[in-house]
């Protein structure tokens, strides 16, 4: 959000690479009128088999693990333009599985296709 304020000061509209938690501040993000690049890198499930380890896991961490796959659908519902990237994935082969997971969590198939094709092309001024 700071980058957008700097851009506004100089009359520049940035394309912002998201951190995966945009769903937490969706109203402020919508107000930026910026386009976003979203990674489909979701948090791994936490190992809570050992009670001693489980006590170090915060509610915030567990909530983010649950909500992260809804990030793209939250931007879609707020009419915020975004494209999807495989950046930050530990294994690029997980891209399709994570895309399917995002669709299960509310992202429409049409918007997913648009976020992979039309939106990136539009941001690069390569879409007719």
Predicted regions and their residues:
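Histidine/acidic residue-rich metal-binding segments in metalloenzymes
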Residues: 1-15, 19-36, 66-79, 97
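His/Asp/Glu-enriched, well-ordered alpha-helical/loop segment
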Residues: 35-128
